[in-house]
A protein has these predicted regions:
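Non-heme di-metal
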Residues: 1-273
Length: 273
């Protein structure tokens, strides 16, 4: 029997629709990758043709961002809506991390690149399940509310540009999570929702690493091609990200993840010239 390549394992995750099943397979394939790494005989990376969009469950209904109902997070329904939005983000993140492996397998990269994104996909799978557990404890579930249809747009826009993918997904979208998660934690603390607080604290701590992986491999690729990382980052974010970056920024956590202020402040409305 021919051993499966890492890119084929990635596609198995991408083509699994149900969220719980997708994340279970993600955990399984991450364990397979790291077990092989420990033996000193890693799986072949291989090359594959991932789908433009990953398989998704029938629910939630995906709406234009402007049509997703706004709910105040101070109410129980608002807190459920906030958790539902986080679950949707985490499920997309699982697919985004497996997609970067599958889509760019033709680009020679050190094995550490795959270690980092498999680890990230594994952690995002855990995050999705933690948040789903919170939703279920509140009498809801993932799919019970409509969700944002634009989450995969960044992946489609950067499907042929690995530097663009690294710039927009971990270094912009996931970095935004570092800015907003402390406020979400406060919302659930005030409500005495300890399960949600615990889940969000896990997410907050581990997302720093995902942003750092993006920054690390973005800088690696720029260095390999003798490019200036800051200039390339500004160019690619202006090309692929729709609109200015929005402060306030969590400068401490961004710095921890290898993102200096001169990367993101020039891309705000006041600095975007």
């Amino acid at each position: 029997m021919t051993q499966k390549t890492l890119t084929k394992l990635a596609i198995e995750v991408l083509t699994t629709a149900d969220g719980r099943a997708k994340t279970a397979l993600s955990h399984q394939h991450a364990a397979t990758w790291f077990a092989a790494r420990k033996t000193g005989e890693p799986l072949a990376i291989g090359q594959a043709s991932p789908p433009l969009r990953p398989s998704r469950p029938e629910k939630p209904d995906l709406l234009d961002p402007r049509n997703v109902p706004k709910r105040k997070p101070g109410s129980p329904a608002g807190r459920i809506a906030l958790l539902h939005a986080v679950a949707h983000i985490e499920l997309n993140a699982v697919d985004l991390h497996w997609d970067i492996i599958a889509r760019f397998g033709h680009i020679p990269m050190p094995l550490g690149f795959y270690d980092d994104w498999v680890k990230s996909a594994d952690e995002e799978s855990k995050h999705f399940n933690l948040v789903c557990d919170c939703l279920e404890s509140l009498g809801s579930y993932y799919g019970d509310l409509p969700a944002h249809a634009g989450m995969w747009r960044a992946a489609e826009d950067t499907a042929e540009d690995i530097l663009g993918r690294l710039a927009v997904v971990p270094m912009v979208l996931e970095a935004r999570g570092l800015d907003v998660t402390p406020g979400m934690i406060d919302v659930f603390k005030k409500a005495g929702a300890t399960q949600a607080v615990d889940a969000l604290n896990v997410i907050y701590a581990e997302e720093v690493g995902h942003v750092a992986f993006g920054s690390k491999w973005f800088n690696f690729l720029c260095g390999r091609d003798n490019l200036d990382p800051k200039d390339v980052f500004h160019k690619l974010v202006r090309k692929y990200f729709h609109g200015p970056l929005k402060p306030p920024f969590n400068e401490e956590k961004r710095a921890e993840a290898g993102l200096p202020p001169d990367f993101y402040w020039p891309l705000t409305e006041s600095g975007n010239v």
